[in-house]
Amino acid sequence: MSLTSRYTHFVPDSTITEILNDSNTPQILLHYANIVNGSTPVHFTSHHDNQVNWTVATLTRMSQYMIPDFMKLFPPLEPTLSLQPDCHCSFINLPRPEIKIPIEILSPPKPNYAKYHYDATTSRVFVNSKHEMYMDNFDVSQLIRDVAAIKTDSPSGNITKGLLKTFHDSIKLRALSPIMSMFHSLLSYRCPCCTSLNGMKKLNHLCFQYSSIYAFLCDMVRPYMCVPFFVDRLGVQILPGFKVSSQYPLLFFEAIELMHTVGLGNLSDSLSGWCFYTWLDRARIGVFREMFNRRGSITMLKSRVVSTGTIFRFSQREFVIESITEQRSTDISPTFEECSFSDSQYIQDNCYKPIYDITTTLDDVKCRWLDVALNYFYGAVLYVTGPVSLALEQSGMGRPGSLNLQFGGTTDVYVEGRWITIDVEPVSPFVSRIKQLADRELAKTKVNGDSLEHGFFEAQTTNSAGNTKETLAGLRSEIIEQHDSPQEGRLLASMAGIRVIDAMRRFNTTFRDHTEFLNEVRRPTKAGMRYQQQRRPRVIQMTGTEAQLGGWLLLNVYEPTYKRLGYTSSGKNIGDIRDMQAVLEASGQNGINSSVDIIGMDASTQNTHVTLLGSAAIKAYNPERIGFPKMFFQSTHNGGDANSRVLPTRVTRDGQTIPKDDDVKYNLPQLAIIYSLHGMHGPTILYDGYFAPAVLTSQTVFRSGWYNTSSQHTMLGSLVLLSLEEDIRNGYKNPYDGAPERSLIAKHWHSIRIIGRVLGDDILLKAFGPPTLTPDELREVTAEVCAEFEHRMELLGFLCERAFSDVMCEFLKQKGFGGAPHMFPDRLVLYTSERGNQAMTNPTTMYRVCDALIIEFNSRSRNIFNTCVSRRVLQTVCSTFALRMTSSGHLVRRSYASRKPYSRVAKVSDGILSELHNHKTVFRIIDYNVLGDHIAMIFLPMLWATNHILGCPPPAIVSISGANIPAASPLTYPSAAITTFWLTATSRRKIDFDSSATAYKKSMSDISNLTAVPLDIIFSFSNAMELSPLSINLDKDYDIDTLRTFGFIVGIMSDSLFPTPSATRAKIKSPVVDDWSRYADSLLNPTRVRSSHHGSEILAESNVVVPYELRYAHRGTAKVRQSMYELPVTDLEYGENTMTTLTQLSESLKVKPGTSKLLRDAMLAGEVFVIPTTHPVTLPCPSFDAHGYGHIIPPNSLQSLLLTHLGLPVSSASYTSSFAKTILSDGKLPGSAEAYLSLYQETYKKGPSAVAYLKDAIGFSDSSMSALERLASNGLYGISGASFAYNPRGGFFFRFDQDNADRFGTSLSPSPTIRRLDIVHMMFTMLMYPTTMVSQNQWMMVRFGRSFSRLARR
């Protein structure tokens, strides 16, 4: 049975054959390539380009069997002299690798079962080496036969089955199918010659045919005459009848990932070919196994590149560049022999040796580019998968670290038959010093004992509660039996496994009794799995709700303490370059940088480490400080006996136990921490399903899923940095525990300054000495400081993995190189993912998932122009979706591959499909049959994602009036500026522009019907009176049919076109969910609830309506509803959503501005006329054209032009993403940042008292409210619709705030009354067309307040 007869998402082979047999197809693809490239305009007066787009979209839906026919029509070609094999930033004269697929891939060996060993004692399968856990190269067809031959259950049979599951799980799709992913990569690919043109010249060839990797792909397909694997609901499958290597799917996705990155300028074509060749070489044994075995040699080669390059060093402070100097690193440079390459001799001689030989003459551009390019040799652009149960020693088992901490005395309490240590007296002087610092610093932290119950509930998330399968199965049966409706019962049962619902259920049971609570603290919980790119798989030790109470209390004192100490860094809070401030400042200054990673910090954390800090936390909650507050356990507000508990206490010192005469009375927060220490290492069960249904993990490892896991590590690292800094400041007189002599620290202690940052197990350290030191002496001083820090961590029992460099440092996966950002494009995986739960959903979801990653390439790539190409191709690839119906017209939910009965969930209206069929200029539908079912493949219009909602950059356009509109830039954001593009392209007006004020005034007056009115009055009137809706007829002035034909109308309906689970489930009415919601609201702070109701009522009297879900009084309800929204879509919901989609498609054919508020509001965008202006732009900083700024801002590039004009961000500016991260996400608040900002703006107009009531209504703290006020006052980000269109990851380097906009605003308009919204609109328009709008430090734009825009140059 062929694939096309089984699967919905393939169009019939006959359809593809017809296209491939068409002699015009090569020209169609070339025409399409020029459209997405921006070098050929789309003609809005013709439907031809829509047809071209549908042809290409159809090809992306071909089956595996048709790929050889496509490759035959478009064979790989050798580059001619005009198509040089290397990109414009490459300098390595590498020949293209000879195509040679290893015989081990074409004829793989049999599976090696002998490396797997069964331990009958633990019922666990293990391997002898940590690298053996990864999937080897073997013949999958043989493995399938071996599994089919298993007749009885046995350990050896389980090993065989587990190995097959390992193969099934080796790839999880991101959003697109393998074939769609391949076509996206091919059509996005630009050869190095065309990359350098940035869309300025029309292409005369299809670039992918000249790719060396495409030649490899063709060679991989040829022996099978198809792509011999596919991915369905069960995972990766091979086609029957073929001998396929287990590494084939990994190599396929690695190939298309590398092809995609060539167009972005991160690899040259020849180097990408060699890179893929190395992965072929490694795949002979196993991709992931050899990746870890061989990465050491690549690290050595990268060290050679960095140590021999001469770079520009950017010395800066808070993003103000103080100096730019040329500098050569003094890092140690390894010899070629020391690199110890283990790849084949062919690769060593023809690839690594030429790279090594040219490293003696590396300038700034070459050095930075090559170091990034070698990252693709270091790690595969794939998620590292494998049975986590085989890697328990790495993350699921405890390890001793460098030593066990010794204590001369302990204080213990007796809890339920067990003595628990709650305080220690360390033997080591240094560990004693850390304990003293912990006691001192935590005692300074203010602890609030009020509303602890409410605070703990508000901290609950909508993640999994970590319950075991057995617990969930019993709970599920109990809930389903209680409900007559199976659908409601299943929904509620699924919700019960979510943390916030689980907590509500337990508050009335186990949280009422100490004994039951303690039993649950030590109950088994579930272990999760994490798969990451370039890193080994990990076990996540989840923690039950009872145990989380103590973790939350510890977090409450640790977090404010280490934030006050000032050594922490918040990671990706803002999302742009300001998150990198520490690494940029450190790497831009002279001296040694130490990037430290604690090896296995979770696994190395002992009970004693937790007690070391936990004892200080118990003291911080001392009754003398906070009394005996109410907190569960049937406690009361009046501080009765239920608010405390007396525990027998003893002291052990020098082996002697000394019982205390008086037992100690502990309050409930102290007891909760003690109980957590009691159950800190309860068992966790890993359900990975590979070689056994479940595996018990270690009971000694520190749980990675505890609330305070990260804060425990951060607190400890901060205290070590504090001890080091204080000891240096005090003269460094008494080194600890046999530390080597630090003579330079002792000599220069008075002038040494430390930069230290810590978060979790990541640490950055750099020291600065007096200016009198020579560079060599400064290196020695900083080396001593870093060595002393590592020594202190070892005294605590942790082993450090460090990287020393005088020009480079890394922290939180962010790297600074000579004071400039050094990004990691190799860590963006576009086509595969960790979970695969968003694969092949609907066009909007698929587009958004992939588009977010492609935009991220703007901040990590040299040639950001190609992100435009990639996003436009993505628009085409995601423009189709299929409906599968039975002969009776009922939708079918599951595919044939699931081997489960079909779920027929709704009946489709034949009338709607007929209506769509009749509008062939708007939609295309291909009908075919699969296993007796009817398939309708629906194609959306060409530019369906080019709108202010999805934000795809518009291509070049010839408008209906004949104006030429250039293609938009990679810095296009989903804003009204895109609507401006559509209105310009479909406007029936023709206006002749003239630079003279008289002609301009006449044009304005004629349009607005305000003749003989002075120009300045027109400006003032239009700004004040919203002239747009009064003076235009949208139906008459714009070609609505063109808006519909090319996809604008469908696009702006995308949110309702493909409903999200939250939109669907918001309509569900369930009495049980309502009861849960009321109970959740009752768990909130009653005082704040009353204030919330009062504030909402007062604001309502001023016509300010606080949305229900944003009110603090209903925050519990919001959590319950959110837990319902995040569950997977059910079959019934799928049917309802699909019917909504069809209905909305039908509605889009009837929409007009006069009948649709959505369309009318979208079309009332601002108007921008492009005319020359003589106002010079004041540059905020020196030109970056000469030096560039790191890897992704080459000299004389679009990025350097914009950075010169816009400048680097201001470190103190407040961004939307920062608010969303620190306030909404970390604070576990419902709603979006946009909703809070819009509400604040509306309230602000009513006066300060209204803002005070808003604070009460939404339940914000003083700090949260200040953050919201800063966000709103930041002008540009204070405008809803602009704030959230801007993506900091897309404009990573550029300053984009109100002050900067105002600086340009004075140049953009002759009107003194220009509105803030107008400035925002101009900024977004400028970012869409930067090369058009900025010319020799002058702008080419002026604003007038009407409803359409002219962006075309005369």
Swiss-Prot record:
It catalyses: RNA(n) + a ribonucleoside 5'-triphosphate = RNA(n+1) + diphosphate. This is RNA-directed RNA polymerase VP1. Keywords: Hydrolase, Nucleotidyltransferase, RNA-directed RNA polymerase, Transferase, Viral RNA replication. Its EC number is 2.7.7.48. It is an enzyme of class 2 (transferase). RNA-directed RNA polymerase that is involved in transcription and genome replication. Following infection, it catalyzes the synthesis of fully conservative plus strands. After core assembly, which consists in recruitment of one capped plus-strand for each genomic segments and polymerase complexes, the polymerase switches mode and catalyzes the synthesis of complementary minus-strands. It comes from the Viruses. It comes from Cryphonectria parasitica mycoreovirus 1 (strain 9B21). Pfam families: CPV_RdRP_N (PF22209), CPV_RdRP_pol_dom (PF22212). InterPro entries: RdRP_N. Gene3D superfamilies: RNA-directed RNA polymerase lambda-3. One of its GO terms (molecular function) is hydrolase activity.
